[in-house]
């Protein structure tokens, strides 16, 4: 499943602007093009829905390449802290003056970097998967003369985790392990976390709570009753769009971590028009033609969420499409069948049809759910699309660093 039809229907100006700017050599191929005004509109909807229900937000940045323009926009809306999914995330955010609220989940902080994280980032909370990691943090925090708040990653029987994301403190070992952590100096257990706590159900066509969430709720009761802890954070990320805030409140969630919701590309957005509108696309161009097929320059195709978990069903049941052409007036009608690319995505295959004739240099538009942090894609930030006065604010790499635009003919 891709988001192309949704973009055509709900934000056609984004497509037309991307094609126009690409054909004028203002946007390079292999770029995730971001409609910054739409991101801002989406963020306002998410924050308003969350604040009205007592839900706190940490914004996730990996999917849009830790982009500083987007981060500052989210800050200006009123979402003041980010979540760093790994150390690299945290470094990028801290370098750009973005406050890190949460780090250590999904990826634990390497021991050699704990001092840097505590002294330079000063995160609100750090997630630990084990007593040993809590001990490492305790030793550094004590040396720095601070008290660091911790979240406990808990694993219950029957919980669901995506491949290569396993680990945490087993529920049956909870009291023993957390009891030991509570005796450490300079750390304080304030909450629990898991992922995914919510996941899109293809049959129900809506996002539903996962067993992980109920493990967290049991854990909170146990820690408060047996250890006398005051748990202030039940961090339950997973498809955190504005539509979900009522459910979060009803289920006792205190913190969530929206990411793809800001660009209108959670799984639910592929099936239903939620409050957030699509705010990005993937732009390429035809490199060459071979028989009836054309080949689009790659670099970001593989980052369109690899087929695992929820996406395996969608990938098997739906084909990928694209738009191709050089004319703004006709581009929305020039739909073609495309092929997904492998990990080394030099090119993406485009299949010809009777209605669309390929030309080298034509723009190619995909509607992907990108994960820029694991790609070679550029990130192009454009403001003014909705007012039909587009301005390119900059082109960035996956780390949020500006790229010299002379490389692209500007």
What are these regions (language model features)?
Residues 242-321:
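Active-site loop ensemble at the mouth of alpha/beta enzyme cores that anchors a bound cofactor
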Residues 1-113, 400-410:
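A charged N-terminal "starter" segment
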Residues 56-201:
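Active-site-proximal beta-alpha core segment in soluble small-molecule metabolic enzymes
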Residues 38, 42, 129, 173, ...:
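Soluble or luminal CAZymes and related metallo-dependent hydrolases
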Residues 124, 148, 185, 232, ...:
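Structural beta-strand/beta-sheet cores of well-ordered domains, especially the beta-sheet scaffolds
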Residues 156-274:
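Active-site loop/helix belt of alpha/beta enzymes
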Residues 294-296, 300-410:
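C-terminal accessory subdomain/extension
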Residues 46, 137, 216:
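Aromatic/hydrophobic pocket-lining residues that form π-stacking "cages" and hydrophobic walls in ligand
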């Amino acid at each position: 499943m891709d988001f192309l039809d949704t973009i055509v229907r709900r934000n056609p100006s984004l497509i037309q602007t991307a094609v126009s700017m690409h054909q004028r050599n203002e946007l390079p191929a292999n770029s995730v093009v971001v409609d910054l005004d739409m991101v801002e509109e989406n963020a306002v909807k998410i924050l308003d829905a969350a604040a009205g229900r007592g839900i706190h937000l940490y914004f996730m940045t990996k999917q849009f390449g830790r982009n500083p323009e987007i981060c500052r926009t989210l800050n200006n809306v009123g979402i003041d802290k980010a979540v760093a999914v790994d150390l690299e995330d945290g470094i990028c955010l801290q370098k750009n003056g973005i406050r890190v609220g949460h780090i250590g989940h999904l990826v634990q902080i390497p021991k050699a970097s704990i001092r840097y994280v505590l002294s330079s980032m000063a995160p609100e909370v750090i997630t630990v998967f084990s007593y040993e990691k809590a001990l490492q943090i305790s030793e550094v925090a004590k040396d720095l003369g601070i008290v660091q708040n911790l979240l406990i990653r808990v694993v219950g029987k029957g919980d669901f985790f995506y491949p290569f994301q396993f680990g945490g403190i087993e529920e049956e070992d909870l009291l023993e392990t957390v009891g030991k952590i509570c005796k450490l100096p300079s750390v304080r257990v304030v909450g629990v976390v898991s992922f995914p706590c919510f996941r899109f159900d293809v049959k129900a066509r809506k996002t539903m709570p996962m067993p992980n969430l109920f493990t967290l709720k049991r854990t909170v009761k146990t820690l408060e009753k047996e250890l006398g802890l005051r748990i202030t954070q039940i961090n339950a990320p997973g498809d955190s769009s504005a539509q979900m805030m009522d459910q979060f409140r009803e289920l006792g969630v205190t913190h969530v971590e929206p990411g793809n919701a800001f660009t209108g590309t959670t799984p639910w957005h592929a099936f239903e028009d939620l409050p957030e509108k699509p705010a990005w696309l993937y732009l390429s161009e035809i490199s060459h033609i071979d028989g009836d097929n054309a080949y689009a320059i790659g670099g970001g195709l593989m980052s369109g969420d690899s087929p695992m978990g929820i996406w395996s069903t969608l990938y098997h049941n739906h084909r990928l499409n694209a738009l191709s052409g050089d004319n703004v007036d006709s581009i929305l009608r020039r739909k073609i069948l495309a092929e997904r690319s492998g990990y080394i995505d030099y090119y993406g295959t485009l299949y010809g049809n009777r209605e669309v004739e390929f030309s080298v240099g034509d723009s190619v538009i995909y509607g992907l759910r990108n994960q820029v942090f694991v790609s070679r894609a550029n990130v192009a930030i454009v403001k003014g699309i909705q007012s039909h006065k587009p301005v390119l604010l900059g082109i960035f790499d996956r780390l949020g660093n500006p790229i010299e635009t002379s490389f692209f003919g500007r």
